[in-house]
Amino acid sequence: MSEELFWKSARELGELYRARQVSPVEVVEAVLERLESVNPKINAMVTVTADQAREQAKAAEERLRSGEDLPPLFGVPMTVKDLAETAGVRTTYGCAAFADYVPEEDAIGWARLKEQGVILLGKTTTPEFGLLGVTESKLTGSTSTPWRPGYNAGGSSGGAAAAVVAGVGPVAWGSDGGGSIRVPSSLCGAVGIKPSIGRIPTADNTDGDSTDGPIARTVLDAAMVFEATAGHHPSDRFSVPRDTRSYVEAALTPGDLTGVRVAACYDLGQKVLDPDVRRLFTQALDDMRAAGATVEEVGIELPDTMLFFDHLNGYEYLEFAEEMRAGGVELWPMIAEVAERAKSVTGRQVSAAFRRGKTEIYNAFAAAMTGADVLVTPTTPVPAFPHDGAAGPTRLVDGQEVPPLGLLIHSMTEPPSHAGLPAISVPGGFDADGLPIGLQFIGRLWADADVISVAARYQRATGWHTRHPAL
């Protein structure tokens, strides 16, 4: 029974709780046993709050017995990325300098989830301040995809995605500024939602690209977490009121994809795509057609992702690197590399990226989606790859020499973030080596419910999410 419990979805757990067929105490114990078994293989956790989780589970059990009307996520165990502040629980930001930091207040999203009665299992790994597309740091080491320990889980929400797919909680809380939810969801075989700009608030939001969001094994579970955390907050100048549409109802849209118009793009003009990813994406398009969708391949003209990233974010990396060095903290090599490149970026280039670049990207997506309900792409140009180091990732993809894969991996997910658009990664198959590949569904600004509806119907039609790694 315990093995069955840790694979249950959040939706299923809620139904079992209310039918008095299982208790939060049983579920939390099963998930903690699973965590103890798999974490040495994937290294997804920074902090485990086992005692606290057991206490919360007992309290939840008592409230469920009382028969009171409780939120849908009540009693569901979950993890939180270690960039989100958790009052009274260590929050390291993936940085050795904050190894013992314990915040006094909760991040907005986590505070809203606590109000729903979720149970905290612990904090998941992230690179230093979430600044990389892989989850590796001096503090925690490297996090692996559950499908092949030793291969990267992606980043920066790598621990969150790896935990969910390994059976450590049905849902997780992550964040995404350029793919940090969607990339690890792709490399680990999870569902990850990057909401439209302003949907989920974060305090002191400075650019609108970054947002918190859910990771889960099903679109429905991710929609449940999204719905519980969305809505305006005065601490975020980009935040918007709650959607008039229910994300949960969108995920429960009945039927197949009949009538859905899909625009499809293989590489978003970035011209680098692993042959296995190309093959699986072609098959996914055929699956959509078989499910009733109309699919039309489109082109899109976007700036070079790596170059635009340097212009938009390079100064932040340079400033961070200088602060860490001044404090005697050794930098992870890829962060140092981006900081070094940033030294050659001019003020004019930074200004152009902010003033014109984002609008040009937004307009390019709008043109590509003319006459379509959603745009679909591969989530990542390559599947999971070996951890950096002596046996690091190849710099050849389909015969092309490319930048380090830990930087290239966000080339398909950065542009929708700069445009502020909703995007979701769902499992889209497995390559010849058994590694998962994600599909990215992108929608129009604030059309989050439409994206969720299409992604949920695709997921039900294919069933890739029903496979579990053999850990």
Model-found features: residue ranges?
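Glycine-rich, small-residue loops and helix-cap segments
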Residues: R20, V31, G75, E115, ...
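Short glycine/serine-rich loop segments
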Residues: P103-H233, S417-G438
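A short helix-breaking turn/cap at a secondary-structure junction
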Residues: V191-Q283, T462-L471
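Short helix-loop capping/hinge segments that flank enzyme active sites or metal/cofactor-binding pockets
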Residues: L73-Y93, T253-C265, G314-A366, T379-V382, ...
